[in-house]
């Protein structure tokens, strides 16, 4: 019975909060609130501006390195396993790949912004 009451209270409170969050912003609609903020320039102008290829390459490089680091995040919890040497070898391989990728990008001047 207590579980049913708790579930009912949680569901009703959630429904009330969601409905208030949905209906409250619609009471006061302003043009500043309705338009997106785009760092000081007019967001309603043409979106077909030239895109810097250097920025794209740096962004892709960041994503690749970020994914490799995300592979290293569970390794502190892997210390609790019995095969510590396998975890150390895996982490060394991942860090080596990360370092080799950084060296490759650095040698090919992929990290230099101005040219």
UniProtKB/Swiss-Prot annotation:
Membrane topology: Multi-pass membrane protein
UniProt-listed Enzyme Commission number(s): 7.1.1.2
Molecular function GO labels: NADH dehydrogenase (ubiquinone) activity
Transmembrane residue ranges: 3-23, 55-75, 84-104
Pfam family, one: Oxidored_q4
GO cellular component terms given for this protein: mitochondrial inner membrane; NADH dehydrogenase complex
GO biological process: mitochondrial electron transport, NADH to ubiquinone
InterPro entries (alphabetical): NADH_UbQ/plastoQ_OxRdtase_su3 (IPR000440), NDAH_ubi_oxred_su3_sf (IPR038430)
Alphabetically ordered keywords of this record: Electron transport, Membrane, Mitochondrion, Mitochondrion inner membrane, NAD, Respiratory chain, Translocase, Transmembrane, Transmembrane helix, Transport, Ubiquinone
Swiss-Prot/TrEMBL catalytic activity: a ubiquinone + NADH + 5 H(+)(in) = a ubiquinol + NAD(+) + 4 H(+)(out)
Subunit structure: Core subunit of respiratory chain NADH dehydrogenase (Complex I) which is composed of 45 different subunits. Interacts with TMEM186. Interacts with TMEM242.
Described purpose of this protein according to its UniProt entry: Core subunit of the mitochondrial membrane respiratory chain NADH dehydrogenase (Complex I) which catalyzes electron transfer from NADH through the respiratory chain, using ubiquinone as an electron acceptor. Essential for the catalytic activity of complex I.
Record-stated family: Belongs to the complex I subunit 3 family.
Name of the protein: NADH-ubiquinone oxidoreductase chain 3
Organism from which the protein derives: Sigmodon hispidus (Hispid cotton rat)
Gene: MT-ND3
């Amino acid at each position: 019975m207590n579980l049913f009451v708790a579930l009912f209270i949680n569901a009703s409170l959630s429904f009330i909060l969601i409905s208030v969050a949905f209906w409250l912003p619609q009471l006061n609609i302003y043009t500043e609130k309705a338009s997106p903020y785009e760092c000081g320039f007019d967001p309603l102008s043409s979106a077909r501006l030239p895109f810097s290829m250097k920025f794209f390459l740096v962004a892709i490089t960041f994503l690749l390195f970020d994914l490799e680091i995300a592979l290293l995040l569970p390794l502190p919890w892997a210390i609790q396993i019995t095969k510590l040497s396998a975890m150390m070898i895996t982490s060394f391989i991942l860090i080596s790949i990360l370092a080799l990728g950084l060296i490759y990008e650095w040698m090919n001047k992929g990290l230099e912004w101005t040219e």
